[in-house]
Amino acid sequence: MSVVCRLLDGTDRYERTVTGSVDVRPEGLLRLGARLSDHRASVDVSLDVTPSPGFDVVRADGAWRPPEPAGQLEDLPDRLARLAGLRLFPGFRRRVVDVLGPDAPGAAQVADAVVEAARLSRQVTRLDPRHVPADPTPLDFRRLDLMAWPEFSDMCFTYSAASTSLFEEPGVRVPATLDMYVPRPGARLAFHRYKRAEIARADGVLTLYQSMFDQVHGFELWYDLDIQTQRILRARALTPRLPYMGICDQAQGRNQTLIGMTLDERWPTALRGVTGGRLGCFQFTDLTGDLFRLLSFE
């Protein structure tokens, strides 16, 4: 057995970038956009969805960017249109793959782009302004988060009961702005995100890198994997920006417990057990999982 990256394509380095944005449509829908690019192609997707708590896909569209890859989902706009009526809930990726066709050329890349767009639905919402303080404290922001996205409860340390008392401590900083909770209709770039992933192969080791930067997050993650034994040799992370600086920090560093773990097809359960849950960080878990998803075991 060994661990391989299906995207190295005979080379020793693979890189992809993702840009994402949220616009607020005049009628109140959120337009979630993402562009995913690598050496093969670039694809743009957009989802018009109802804000929380609905998360209903009203419209979906997308297109390959020049140079268009030959033979890869040439009917992409038609296939994406079939996403209308779905909801951005757990299992959405699987539904997207079913709609695109799991064996269709380019389907995996498009599905990744659609999921990146869908994730932005948990960054911008439209709350009743009467529920939003003019000068919110960190605890107020947490209350707004749980009002908008109740599914966050116990999803990570920050949204667990164990962290509540910490919000009264000095030094807790929140980079979010009220525009993310009560954006005006027609607002452009209410939220924007940039991600970069890289996988390099050298001397029997795969080095995995992932970064994500937006208004409220700054993550950089590195993992070294032994190709033959499939063991994680080293793990490192930098988190210069977090939604609740002074609180989210306490869930970081759990990647160190991944060192020595042997990766196989069961990695999703193992990863969630180590870095997720009420003591963990779901963004950290997602970013790591996105890297591991690019691997296969032979």
Describe the residue ranges of each PLM region:
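Active-site- and interface-proximal helix/loop "cap" or "latch" segments in soluble metabolic
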Residues: 1-166, 212-298
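Short, compositionally biased leader-like segments
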Residues: 167-206
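Short, basic/aromatic recognition patches
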Residues: 207-211
